[in-house]
Regions:
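Catalytic cores of nucleic-acid ligases and guanylyltransferases
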Residues: 1-173
Length: 173
């Protein structure tokens, strides 16, 4: 089971990762008759910690990656409408002309130690939000996913840079 834990801003939280299963039946046995379905994007999972103007980004391995994404650091205060929050998202490189997603390898050009400013221009991104773990001093992990998703959609202002990963609630009847 999931144990209660104390959330502290700027201390990354180990993400929940998907388990492999052999069949649809096994999925239903593990998670029940109602579940959310989302697209799997080919990007970098990120945990975004925000408190006022202070913003830090962490990878799924809990590594601080803020320096690779100065554009996110710059734009987040205009997108997030909360005093503080911990959000989960997938960063995906895009083709600026078509809006199409680019392969993960293109995004990894951002991970070079030098010429970050050039990489920001050459490899534009979108931040695709899918969960909220903490908001305005409250632990959101105790809420069910649908409630967290509503809260996320209330505080993240969607635009061409910040989007929600499309989600569908499915039922096994």
């Amino acid at each position: 089971g999931i144990e209660k834990f104390k959330i502290k801003l700027f201390n990354p939280i180990r993400p929940m990762l998907a388990d492999r299963v052999k069949s649809e039946k096994e999925v239903i046995e593990k998670i029940g008759n109602e579940f959310a379905i989302e697209y799997k994007l080919d990007g970098e999972r990120v945990q975004i910690h925000v408190e006022g103007e202070k913003i830090e980004l962490f990878s799924r391995s809990l590594e601080k990656i803020s320096s690779y994404y100065p554009d996110i650091i710059e734009k987040i205060p205009k997108i997030i409408q909360a005093e503080n929050a911990i959000l989960e998202a997938e960063i995906v490189a895009i083709n600026e002309n078509t809006g199409d997603f680019l392969p993960f390898q293109e995004l990894m050009h951002r991970r070079r130690k030098y010429k970050i400013e050039k990489a920001v221009t050459e490899y534009p991104i979108t931040v695709n939000f899918f969960d909220i773990l903490y908001c305005n001093g409250k632990n959101c992990t105790e809420l069910n996913y649908s409630e967290r998703r509503k809260k996320l959609e209330n505080i993240v202002k969607e635009n061409e840079f910040a989007k929600y990963i499309p989600m569908t609630i499915a039922k096994n009847e």
